Each structure stands twice: as C-alpha cells, then as structure tokens.
Amino acid sequence: MKRNGLRTVVVLALTIFLLNAPVCATASRLQDTCAEARDEVALRPEWMRILHDTLPICKISIPGSHDSGSIKGGHMLKTQATDIPAQLRQGIRAFDIRLEKKGNKLGVFHSHAFQDIYWEDDVLPAFIHFLQTYPSETLIVSLKKEGGELRDYASLLSVSLSSPEYQSYFVMDFRPELTLKDCRGKILFLHRDHAMDNYPGAACVGWEDDSTCLLTLR
C-alpha cells in the first residue's frame, strides 16, 4: 500500500450517501430475513456495469451505508434496515465495517454492541461471493477497530487480508489515478487504523469521526 510518495495531499473524493434505518438479520449469519424491507428497495446488483472503464474512482458518486453491519443494540445503535448481502443487491457499494476481537475472530460491533456476525465468516465471504457473481462491480470498504487492543485487531485482520485465496479480489495499492477498470471485481479498503504493514488498500490513519479522510502521499 502506498503511504509515502508524492508530497501530495489527496482528498479522497468518493461521495458516499449514508443510509440509516432499522435492521433485520438472523442471530448468527447474514441471511435475508426481512422481505418487506427488501421489497421496498429496487435491486441494482450491476449498476456499475454501464459506467465507462476509464472513469476515475474518485469521480464516481458511490452510495454507502453507515455502520453497515449494525443489526442490534436498540434504537440508539441500529443503523440498517437490511443486512449486508441485501445492501449489495440494492446497489450499496461503500461499507463502514467496525471490528473488535471476539474469541479468536473479529466480530462486527457498533460501540459495545456485538452484532452476532464475524468478519472472517460472514462479511468478507459475502463481499467476495458478490464480486464473483457480479465482476463489473467494485466495493469500497472502510475498516475500523471499534474496541479492544490494536495488536489483537492487527493480528486477526492480517490473517484474513493475507489469505492467498482472496488476493485477486483486493486493490493492493491505492493511487489517485485509479480507474473503475482497475477496481472492477475488487475491494478497495480504507484503513482507519495502522494495523499492519503492506496491507491492501489506502491508509486513512487519524481519520476522526465526523471528518473528511485525507490521504497523504509523499
């Protein structure tokens, strides 16, 4: 991942529309259990297919969801009406994933509330499966340590992001001139914590809440 290079400050100009609503999902897996909510939103699983390959990623308005996996915790913590697979089919392409060590895995959390889904078992496989089915699409995935020790988060995240079976689905090096063609069928990660060296995507270390992410390339 390029964190040093050009002496340029690049504002990541991805316009992300954050969608908030009550949630539905099962207690253990990301399954579709809320038919009414799904029916209310038109399915757009391949909307990026009609966009030109030469479009810079930073020039595309990309719909996203805030605390994308937040399915529990009461009215103060729930943020979504549909689970992540349903969001993917509805056209969401930017995801805000908050993780914390839970046992020997990374659980999805919103504040203190565990969402009964795991990064390794549920979320990342859902992303990969979607891209296998719809290779015209690209996903922007923000990863943040929601709690716990940084070393635990870093160790577990490194294992999943270093898995050989997933490497072809990751944008390995961020650069300002990335085009849609560069990213089709792949995930562009935005890392909000310096968890490890040489991880895929872009470093947004120091990205505070309610602020803009600035990527500094020297």
Feature map (PLM): residue ranges:
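Bacterial N-terminal signal peptides that target proteins for export
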Residues: 2-10
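Active-site beta-loop-alpha junctions enriched in small/polar residues
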Residues: 65, 100, 144-146, 192-194
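Acidic, His- and aromatic-enriched active-site or binding-groove loops in soluble protein domains
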Residues: 161-176, 180
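Long, acidic (Asp/Glu-rich), low-complexity accessory segments flanking structured domains
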Residues: 26-90, 101-133, 138, 197, ...
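Loop/turn elements at helix/coil->beta-strand transitions in domains of secreted/extracellular proteins
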Residues: 90-93, 134-140, 166, 184-186
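Hydrophobic faces of well-ordered beta-strands that scaffold small-molecule active sites
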Residues: 60, 95-97, 139-141, 189
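C-terminal active-site rim and adjoining tail of enzyme catalytic domains
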Residues: 190-218
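Bacterial N-terminal signal peptides
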Residues: 11-20
